[in-house]
């Protein structure tokens, strides 16, 4: 497809790509204001379909309006992805934010080389969800300027549609249904492991409240101190390393996200095995 026909193309995007971008934004390093990554997909006779993506580490230099991408990392991840999905090609890049950033022209030059004959697409995702909606906009750069003079880039909007296959619709409806449900019963049916974590956390909270009340009563001379209890508390406190609350919160949330991801994947695998077993039984009959 010609570079000049990129804006006329029909562009579809898989819902999983948007979930990947949101997950990358939630896991971004502390201090980073945005997430940048590569868009992968297929181009079938002018019909683009964005099916995958991955995040590329970067370093921002706002004082000189420059962003340094880890090109070596991007090349390695792209090679690994090509081994797994040989039909996917680089279609452009994504960036989180409300609008096209000033560094978009610099990133466009890099991805123009990666895309070859196809004009790179630029996806902007507002992952803050302040308006309770996921805002997505797709752009394609067009060269502007006078012949023989200085030329620049103008990013024009490109129509973007979410590709909803049968499997995608089932997953999205399940997510929507669970998000609208409230109460412990629904949570217990969907992710019982998370309910166990909540119950264990409540039990720890009750035990901590009991210990704090005991210490307060001893300090207020309302209760006689017990040397055995004191030594046990000292041993328990010294056994746990002192950790900053923010670091502990970050570590806990990271482990919780990993656990939820593992639960989701295991549930999907279990469902797929059950469906395969039923299909096999139908074929035997």
UniProtKB/Swiss-Prot annotation:
InterPro entries: eIF3f, EIF3F/CSN6-like_C, JAMM/MPN+_dom, MPN
Pfam families: JAB, MitMem_reg
GO molecular function: metallopeptidase activity; translation initiation factor activity; translation initiation factor binding
Keywords in alphabetical order: Cytoplasm, Initiation factor, Protein biosynthesis
Location of the protein in the cell: Cytoplasm
Function comment: Component of the eukaryotic translation initiation factor 3 (eIF-3) complex, which is involved in protein synthesis of a specialized repertoire of mRNAs and, together with other initiation factors, stimulates binding of mRNA and methionyl-tRNAi to the 40S ribosome. The eIF-3 complex specifically targets and initiates translation of a subset of mRNAs involved in cell proliferation.
Protein name as catalogued: Eukaryotic translation initiation factor 3 subunit F-2
Source organism (scientific name): Drosophila erecta
């Amino acid at each position: 497809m010609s570079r000049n026909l990129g804006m006329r193309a029909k562009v579809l995007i898989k819902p999983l790509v948007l979930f990947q971008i949101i997950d990358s934004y939630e896991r971004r390093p502390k201090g980073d204001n945005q997430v940048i990554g590569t868009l992968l997909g297929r181009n079938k006779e002018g019909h683009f379909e964005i099916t995958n993506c991955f995040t590329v580490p970067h370093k921002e230099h706002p004082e000189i309006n420059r962003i340094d991408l880890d090109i070596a990392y991007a090349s390695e991840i792209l090679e690994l992805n090509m081994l797994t999905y040989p039909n996917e090609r680089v279609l452009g890049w994504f960036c989180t934010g409300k609008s096209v950033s000033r560094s978009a022209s610099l990133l466009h030059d890099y991805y123009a080389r990666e895309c070859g004959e196809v004009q790179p697409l630029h996806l902007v995702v507002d992952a803050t969800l302040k308006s309770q909606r996921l805002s997505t906009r797709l752009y394609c750069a067009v060269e502007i300027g006078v012949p023989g003079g200085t030329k620049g880039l103008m990013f024009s909007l490109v129509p973007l549609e979410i590709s909803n296959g049968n499997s995608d619709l089932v997953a999205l409806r399940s997510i929507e249904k669970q998000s609208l449900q409230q109460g412990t019963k629904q949570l217990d049916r969907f992710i019982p492991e998370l309910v166990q974590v909540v119950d264990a956390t409540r039990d720890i909270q009750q035990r901590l409240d009991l210990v704090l009340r005991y210490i307060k009563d001893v300090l207020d001379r309302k209760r006689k101190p017990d040397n055995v209890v004191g030594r046990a508390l000292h041993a328990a406190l010294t056994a746990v390393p002192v950790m900053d609350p923010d670091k502990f919160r970050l570590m806990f949330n990271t482990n919780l996200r990993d656990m939820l991801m593992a639960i989701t994947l295991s549930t999907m695998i279990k469902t797929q095995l059950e469906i395969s077993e039923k299909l096999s039984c139908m074929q035997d009959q």
